[in-house]
């Protein structure tokens, strides 16, 4: 059957117009779906980050890893740049509590002392024989022992980690335990000074759990707890500026110290006298908080800073 030549074209135009409308609607639905999915994942990620930090803030410090290398920037002590960028992208401000209260190594050297283990043994033994100190109530790993030597008794402090029940024993047992630690008899006041050169089996670094060797360099904190210099430096510059044993917070001493050291450069941290007999003096440009921090160190460690290391 032949098609008439004069057939109207309005039917084909209506079909073409309807097809174009369906294509536009389909494209609009796809665009809106993509936008909705993006907003959904954005909100989901933001909620996940929020609840993650909320749950982590509720956990104690003891449940966290000992030293976290991947979350902390060694130079600034803040969270890694990737985490900061993630917080900026998600529009979520990471709580300041999660930013580690750490310090720089230069600032740590201002309030603590480095001493070889063999010298620390000598100073501890001499302090146990002649001087008197008092126990800091904030430390749970210390015990006071009253030991008589001649007519004048002396009060000495020992640090016990492996045997926490040492303070509940009798006076004889405590004196015997102290004698074993110092490798000498408690009633012998004329023992040779060479006895302190024997390594103490109870002396070990609480961070790495390795025994101290004679050539090891220890860092003594103002709370009189000692650790390997490398271990405690890593702890306080990457994890938390507090003593791993007594949990005494030293970050408050470094809040203004870091600001002063940034103005006067690295030499500002070393312009403070490290001991009462040191010839180096405190520069006028350094903040007063440095002197207060040093006075805290000297008052908390009198028997160590009393002589040149």
From Swiss-Prot:
GO terms for biological process: meiotic cell cycle; ubiquitin-dependent protein catabolic process. One of its GO terms (molecular function) is ubiquitin protein ligase activity. It is a single-pass membrane protein. Keywords: Meiosis, Membrane, Metal-binding, Transmembrane, Transmembrane helix, Zinc, Zinc-finger. Its main location: membrane. It comes from the Eukaryota. Pfam families: zf-RING_2. The keyword Zinc-finger applies. One of its GO terms (cellular component) is cytoplasm. InterPro entries: E3_ligase_sorting_rcpt, RNF11_RING-H2, Znf_RING, Znf_RING-CH, Znf_RING/FYVE/PHD. It is found in: Membrane. A zinc finger (RING-type) spans 205-247. The chain crosses the membrane at residues 23-43. Has a role in meiosis. PANTHER family: OS02G0798600 PROTEIN, RING ZINC FINGER DOMAIN SUPERFAMILY PROTEIN-RELATED. This is RING finger protein mug145. It comes from Schizosaccharomyces pombe (strain 972 / ATCC 24843). The lineage of its organism: Eukaryota, Fungi, Dikarya, Ascomycota, Taphrinomycotina. The gene is mug145.
